[in-house]
Amino acid sequence: MFLDQITIELRAGKGGNGVVAWRKEKYLPKGGPYGGNGGVGGSIIIESATHVYSFESYRNIRFLKAEDGRPGATNNRSGKNGKDLVLIVPEGTLLRDVETKEILYDFAKSGERLVVCRGGKGGKGNTFFKTSTNRAPTKATPGKPGEIRQVELELKLIADIGLVGFPNAGKSTLFNTLARTEVKVGAYPFTTLQPVLGLVPCQEKLYQKPWIIADIPGIIEGAHQNRGLGLDFLRHIERTRLLLFVIDICGCERSSPEEDLRILMDELVHYREDLADKNRIIALNKIDDLLPDERQERLESFQKLFPSETFVLVSGLTGEGVDLLNSLFTNKLAV
């Protein structure tokens, strides 16, 4: 499954120690101090990128450490600085300090960088302590420790595709078929109690990155007034690039499938008017319950009532129509 939250301890590198050394040359019996400073410890940097879409590369990692600085050397040579450790995370990553609960940064766009833990400063060699009154210092200092911080990385629900529908519309079954995974499915409302992310392979070979798909918990009429699971999940919808409305083509006792679609659209507009302009596809699901002629009749009814919408007949249970749906994702998103 999609890994969208991790806690990890980050340890910057320790600074290298300064050294005590003396200049030793044939004609300089009292050449004086010649010990170099230690190198700076490596820092830990977090950077966001578009080619990363989960925290999978950090799975089961409890801590990460940057390289220590090297000690100073003779001939007044400074030690080599430790290499910085750069963690690449997806766009939409929220960085939080575990101890203080403070949000350190919101990586909203690709290419953003933040130094999370700074490496320790290098110690001073005895050359540093030479003065007019102390010509032969024997003092050197150790390197400083690097910063240590335990952080939580959370991927905000920034998905390419968001599945929207009433409870029991078959969203989770369709999600499982698209993402080739297994989300809990049941014949009762709100099987999905929190958003679930998955990956849908893109059929366009030139587009290497899979689509991130989100199964949003079922919306009910009045969700914009915080009924049901309410506003928390409507907020997730605004962060998606494409909405996939999932409609039970057979309808339910309460209303017709056409009325279900109208209510869903109204809920989104009541929550935020600009959601009406978001790219969308309407999946008429559970066609396995209908004969071919009945499917076509229902499709024509929808097309007549909603002439500007894109419809596709699918069955999350049998997989019928899923390839066509995937090609529509490519047409809508691979731009």
From Swiss-Prot:
This is GTPase Obg. An essential GTPase (4.1 pmol GTP/min). Cannot substitute endogenous obg in E.coli, has a partially dominant-negative phenotype upon overexpression in liquid culture leading to decreased growth rate in a concentration-dependent fashion, with 50% of cells being elongated. Binds GTP, GDP and possibly (p)ppGpp with moderate affinity, with high nucleotide exchange rates and a fairly low GTP hydrolysis rate. It may play a role in control of the cell cycle, stress response, ribosome biogenesis and in those bacteria that undergo differentiation, in morphogenesis control. It comes from the Bacteria. GTP binds at residues 165-172, 190-194, 215-218, 285-288, 315-317. Residues 1-158 form the Obg domain. Keywords: Cytoplasm, GTP-binding, Hydrolase, Magnesium, Metal-binding, Nucleotide-binding. Monomer. It is found in: Cytoplasm. One of its GO terms (molecular function) is ribosome binding. CDD domains: Obg. SUPFAM superfamilies: Obg GTP-binding protein N-terminal domain, P-loop containing nucleoside triphosphate hydrolases. Its cofactor is Mg(2+).
